[in-house]
Swiss-Prot record:
InterPro entries: IF_conserved, IF_rod_dom, Intermediate_filament, Keratin_I. Residues 6-37 are annotated as: Coil 1A. The lineage of its organism: Eukaryota, Metazoa, Chordata, Craniata, Vertebrata. Residues 2-310 form the IF rod domain. It comes from the Eukaryota. Residues 148-163 are annotated as: Linker 12. Residues 49-147 are annotated as: Coil 1B. It comes from Carassius auratus (Goldfish). This is Glial fibrillary acidic protein. Residues 38-48 are annotated as: Linker 1. It holds the Pfam family Filament.
Length: 365
């Protein structure tokens, strides 16, 4: 019966050895995969994540700086636009004042032209009156001469005839002097009035010319300011459109970056979960391996002819640490025999036994 038990134990031992070899091979593969995941993937993903995060922050900072610069330019353009509007209002007020002055000058010119026409009419009337008086004077002189000729009497040769011719000449000279004086006074008055009107017309014409020049200058300035205002309005609209486009693009890019960050975080979480799953599998395999090591050691003692019967209880394996890339597991099984207690402690790291100790205590009956 003991031989059958040993044979059965040998068969079980052989199957356990095959299973242990298979598990050791799987353990090595899992350890290599774990080292790869622990040493390379997390750092690479972390570096990629940090690099993308830094790039996104740089882009966000650049967009914020561009936005602030565009806002400053927009404020400056708004200030320039307000200044130009103020200047435009002032120029419009000056133009209105110039137009009012021009209308006043036009009224003065019209009044001066009307006065000139009236004076010319008076001069024509005076010249007509002078011509009429001259004709009347000549007619009166002719009638007087005819009367004097008709009233002449013949006297004797020794009697001297009255000096009528001299009197007529004196009268004619007096009338001619009066007519000449009146003509000269009229001509002088006409010349003075004409000169005054000419000076007034010249002054009004000069003022009108200056007013026209000022009006043209104001008109050119208004046109230039209007063109500048339209240009600034176009620039302001263009900058506002660019600002809206940049804000929309910034919002879209920010949303894309947030999606990318969320996706990377999800991938990192998935990798962490997968790593935890592999670590759990590795822990389970280590537990199985330790149990098999204990059972193999027990069978080895049986094969060496140990006479006592060993009952190995089910062990609990805890306190596995993977944070510092090291695994510290202590197993303290208790082997109950009839007369003694064997306690074996095995400590492993990365799948290799680094410390093993066995103690034996006598069991009191």
């Amino acid at each position: 019966r003991e031989v059958d038990r040993v044979m059965g134990l040998n068969d079980r031992f052989a199957s356990y050895i095959e299973k242990v070899r298979f598990l050791e091979q799987q353990n090595k593969m899992l350890v290599a995969e774990l080292n790869q995941l622990r040493g390379k993937e997390p750092s690479r993903l972390g570096d990629i994540y940090q690099e993308e995060l830094r790039e996104l922050r740089r882009q966000v900072d650049g967009l914020n700086a561009g936005k602030a610069r565009l806002e400053i330019e927009r404020d400056n353009l708004a200030s320039d636009l307000a200044t130009l509007k103020q200047r435009l209002q002032e120029e419009n007020a000056l133009r209105q004042e110039a137009e009012n002055n021009l209308n006043t000058f036009r009224q003065d010119v019209d009044e001066a032209a009307l006065n000139r026409v009236q004076l010319e009419r008076k001069i024509d009337a005076l010249q007509d009156e002078i011509s009429f008086l001259r004709k009347v004077h000549e007619e009166e002189m002719r009638q007087l001469q005819e009367q004097l000729i008709a009233q002449q009497v013949h006297v004797d040769l020794d009697v001297s005839k009255p000096d009528l011719t001299t009197a007529l000449k004196e009268i004619r000279a007096q009338f001619e002097a009066m007519a000449t004086s009146n003509m000269q006074e009229t001509e002088e008055w006409y010349r003075s009035k004409f000169a005054d009107l000419t000076d007034a017309a010249g002054r009004n014409a000069e003022a009108l010319r200056q007013a026209k020049q000022e009006a043209n200058e104001y008109r050119r300035q208004i046109q230039g300011l209007t063109c500048d205002l339209e240009s600034l309005r176009g620039s302001n609209e263009s900058l506002e459109r660019q600002l809206r486009e940049m804000e929309e693009r910034f919002a879209i890019e920010t949303a894309g970056y947030q999606d990318t960050v969320a996706r990377l975080e999800d991938e990192i979480q998935m990798l962490k979960e997968e790593m935890a799953r592999h670590l759990q599998e590795y822990q389970d395999l280590l537990n199985v391996k330790l149990a098999l090591d204990i059972e193999i050691a027990t069978y080895r003692k049986l094969l060496e002819g140990e006479e006592s019967r060993i009952t190995v209880p089910v062990q609990n394996f805890t306190n596995l640490q993977f944070r510092d890339t090291s695994l510290d597991t202590k197993l303290t099984p208790e082997a109950h025999v009839k007369r003694s207690i064997v306690v074996r402690t095995v400590e492993t790291r990365d799948g290799e036994i680094i410390k093993e100790s066995t103690t034996e205590r006598k069991d009191l009956p």
